[in-house]
């Protein structure tokens, strides 16, 4: 990789490299931004903010402001150097116009301007321009304001000077195209989570997020995300709902073979492993070579230390320690910067660069060895926890072996309570996890027997967030779910905690619970189980929530099921002149109040039902919320519920 002095690198039109035109983006938008739903819509903001982050990483930008305007347009402004506006040597037009209208044009493709840069697909801001009905670019440079406007990626007029200024930087405003996106309404929380994540990943950068759309009381929201200590604060944030095993964050920030590596890790008393990895600020959900390097170093160093200091303890417990024992109760964040990342995997979020494994392995190995030598007391606490984890793993294997059935599709050994479907084609089949035996009975009568299977859940299932790993396999309800789905553990190595989903029997797993507090609790318990034990099912899009109706509204011959308070209010306005007493209103407290026919037409019929797909937009934030809502500590949970009470449905 070429080296250069960041302050000496001049950033002008000659640094902008041009690769291809924009028509392709409007024809096949999903290829460039992932999809055209809510996810892709928010991706436009990330692409634009990534430009500002690149300026910050190069040392030129300290402040980024992101604003959601009342008309759902977005403004991103930074105090970097400003996109160059001089004439491009090859293109014969302003560099700003080239950056804004040519795909893959930008400083990030010229090695001198940026050593590394973010952007999932690296498509740059021109892609945002192509997918917006209108975009306004302003550059504050050399005391002048340069401006150009575009429509669907095409310039409306040449770059012109529209005023003078003391500011420095770039301001982008865009209006997403409703003909391309299925929704153009931005969600504050989704943007806030990503901006918080970016602030932690890039210590010292201030990101201000403002939502100018007033709420019901007429208030606007604004938050500033800033982290002085970066990953050290990030790992504490994720772990704030858990009890710490040791107080220290083990931290390193170094460079190996020209690759900047930053890692923060800490141990807690929980039983789950939570490692979040990033490449150029992108969350590599599927891991990759940098994660493999981290795990190798962790196992190598801790195993050596445990064998040197606790050999008698290990022999007495009659166990052999394996890699996963070192990761139980570990929360870690790995952030690497790679000049030319190769992304693989289904969602293009797995790092393939082989050099990252060796670099991370070396960096983590050195830092961890030093920490253990300098902190014998904390090191002993870690080793004790590792031995406990290994002992529990052996117990888990025994518990699992006693219940694991031989062949998931063989028909033998399925749970007695499961009413299975007749089809054997997993992609057509659905499994309903139904709260309570009575609702389970109605669901069994209502279902389409060819493709819909029913598994009733009795009472509240085990809260796995508070339980040792092997306890799940001792719980009948959890075992029934695992067995019914055809999931196996310990296939890829005798004691692996990795769930094997190759023989998954249903491609849709639907949680069906009452629309009250108990129902929501059961949904959360089941989601926690999936998130901690088989997250790949969520990532592959197999987990759903059923949406039973809350009301049945009748007026004369009009009979309608309403799935929200808003729908009910609309019905009352339309058919009851706003008077609730003039219509017949039935409130469904539970699934059991509906007969099988009603349950089928409202909640189970694929033609008419509503389903919510469970997705993990932001793994670190999901980890934090699950640990806080389902963990031991009551304080943070109360604070969270109070802060989010406005968004939650509280059933008195």
Where are these regions (language model features)?
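Helical (often loop-to-helix) elements that flank the catalytic cores of nucleotide-handling enzymes
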Residues: 89, 344-357, 561-567, 571-572
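C-terminal interaction appendages of subunits in large macromolecular complexes
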Residues: 391-410, 425-430, 441, 445-447, ...
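Conserved short strand/loop->alpha-helix "switch" segment adjacent to the catalytic nucleotide/phosphoryl-transfer site
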Residues: 27-46
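A short glycine-centered beta->alpha linker in the GHKL/HATPase_c
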Residues: 82-87
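Short adenine-binding "F-helix/F-box" segment of the Bergerat
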Residues: 88-89, 96
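GHKL-family ATPase ATP-binding module
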Residues: 1-15, 22, 44-46, 54-56, ...
């Amino acid at each position: 990789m070429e080296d250069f002095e960041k302050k000496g690198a001049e950033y002008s039109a000659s640094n902008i490299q041009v690769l291809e035109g924009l028509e392709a983006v409007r024809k096949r938008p999903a290829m460039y931004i992932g999809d055209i739903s809510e996810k892709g819509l928010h991706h436009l903001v990330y692409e634009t903010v990534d430009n500002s982050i690149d300026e910050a990483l190069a040392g030129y930008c300290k402040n980024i402001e992101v604003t959601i305007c009342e008309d759902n347009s977005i403004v991103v402004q930074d105090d970097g150097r400003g996109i160059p506006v001089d004439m491009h040597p090859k293109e014969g037009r302003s560099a700003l116009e080239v950056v804004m209208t040519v795909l893959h044009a930008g400083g990030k493709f010229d090695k001198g301007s940026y050593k590394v840069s973010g952007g999932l697909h690296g498509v740059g801001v021109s892609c945002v321009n192509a997918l917006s009905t209108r975009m306004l670019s302003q550059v504050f440079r050399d005391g002048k304001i340069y401006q150009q406007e575009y429509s669907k990626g095409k310039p409306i007029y040449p770059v012109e000077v529209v005023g003078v200024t003391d500011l420095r930087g770039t301001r982008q405003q865009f209006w997403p195209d409703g003909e391309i996106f299925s929704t153009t309404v931005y969600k504050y929380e989704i943007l806030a989570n990503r901006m918080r994540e970016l602030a932690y990943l890039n210590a010292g950068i201030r990101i201000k997020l403002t939502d100018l759309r007033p709420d019901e009381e007429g208030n606007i929201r604004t938050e500033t995300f800033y982290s002085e200590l970066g990953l050290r604060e990030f790992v504490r944030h994720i772990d704030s709902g858990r009890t710490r095993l040791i107080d220290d964050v083990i931290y390193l920030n170094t460079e190996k073979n020209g690759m900047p590596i930053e890692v923060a890790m800490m141990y807690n008393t929980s039983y789950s492993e939570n490692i979040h990895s990033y490449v150029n600020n992108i969350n590599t959900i599927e891991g990759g070579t940098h994660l493999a390097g981290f795990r190798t170093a962790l196992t190598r160093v801790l195993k050596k230390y445990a064998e040197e200091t606790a050999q008698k303890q290990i022999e007495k417990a009659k166990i052999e320690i394996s890699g996963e024992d070192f990761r139980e109760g570990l929360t870690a964040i790995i952030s690497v910067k790679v000049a030319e990342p190769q992304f693989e995997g289904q969602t293009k979020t797995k790092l393939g660069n082989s050099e990252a494994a060796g670099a991370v392995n070396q960096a983590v190995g050195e830092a961890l060895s030093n920490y253990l030598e300098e902190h014998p007391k904390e090191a002993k606490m870690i080793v004790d926890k590792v031995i406990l984890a290994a002992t529990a793993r052996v117990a888990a294997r025994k518990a699992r072996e006693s219940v694991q059935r031989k062949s998931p599709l063989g028909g033998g050994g399925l749970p007695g309570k499961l009413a299975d479907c007749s089809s054997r084609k997993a992609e057509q089949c659905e499994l309903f996890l139904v709260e309570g035996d009575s609702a389970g009975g109605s669901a069994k009568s209502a279902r389409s027997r060819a493709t819909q299977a029913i598994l009733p859940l009795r009472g509240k299932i085990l809260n796995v967030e508070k339980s040792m790993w092997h306890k799940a396999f001792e719980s009948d309800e959890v075992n029934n779910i695992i067995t019914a789905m055809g999931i196996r553990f310990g296939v890829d190595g005798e004691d692996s905690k990795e769930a094997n989903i190759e023989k998954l029997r249903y491609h849709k797993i639907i949680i069906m619970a009452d629309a009250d507090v108990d129902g929501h609790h059961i949904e959360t318990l089941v989601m926690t189980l999936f998130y901690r034990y088989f997250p790949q099912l969520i990532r592959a899009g197999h987990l759903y929530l059923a949406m039973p109706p809350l009301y049945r509204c009748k007026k004369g011959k009009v009979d309608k099921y309403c799935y929200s308070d808003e729908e009910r209010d609309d019905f009352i306005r339309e058919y009851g002149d706003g008077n609730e007493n003039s219509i017949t209103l039935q409130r469904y407290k539970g699934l059991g109040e509906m007969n099988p026919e009603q349950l089928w037409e409202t909640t189970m019929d694929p033609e008419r039902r509503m389903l919510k797909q469970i997705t993990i937009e932001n793994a670190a934030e999901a980890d934090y919320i699950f640990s806080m809502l389902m963990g031991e500590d009551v304080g943070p949970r109360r604070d969270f519920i109070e802060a989010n009470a406005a968004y939650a449905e509280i059933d008195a």
